[in-house]
Amino acid sequence: MSKAFTKETDSADDDEGLALPPLPPGGKNYITPSGYARLRAELLDLIDNERPKIVDVVHWAASNGDRSENGDYLYGKKRLREIDRRIRFLTKRLEIAEVVDPSLHAGSEQVFFGATVTYSDDEDGERTITIMGIDEADSRMGQVSWISPVARALLKAHVGDEVQLPTPGGVRHLEVVEVQYPPRSAA
């Protein structure tokens, strides 16, 4: 069949649109306990709330007759595919997640996964970032993935250490100013 006669939505079940940066070869999908809880809560909400609502809308719209020009039906089916894709994605990511509690390093001056690190360099001055899992990093919030170049450069450094960060513009020298971890929770 010629591709000219297919709908653009024929490939809607591909998970390409939800792909996050791949894990490094042999790498693990590290995630903080709070990040794991957020992803799990999103998955359960999709399964228990969002998907059933859309299924009801699609069922109601399908009962209205002609589906080819039924906006509620067409939009509902599209939304259902999006939800199913996100459910598959979250399920896969949670299955391979390795929960790492950064509070176990509370009081340490060495940079490990989950650390909030303040570093300085000659170009940007001081900057604070938190090293998180791939699925929970958000650069707008100062959270970087543990596989990012800056996190890789800082991991295992101690307060006062100077590390090198290779960049396209040359090597930058970063000095670790402060390392913080969340406090240990009373278990």
Which residues does each predicted region cover?
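Helix-rich terminal scaffold detector
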Residues: 1-49, 53-88, 183-187
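Residue-level signal for pocket-adjacent positions within structured domains
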Residues: 18, 26, 94-95, 126, ...
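Juxtamembrane/interface motifs at transmembrane-helix termini
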Residues: 58-59, 91-96, 148-149, 185
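Hydrophobic residues in alpha-helical segments
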Residues: 62-65, 94, 154
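Non-DNA-binding regulatory cores of transcription-related proteins
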Residues: 100-174, 180, 186
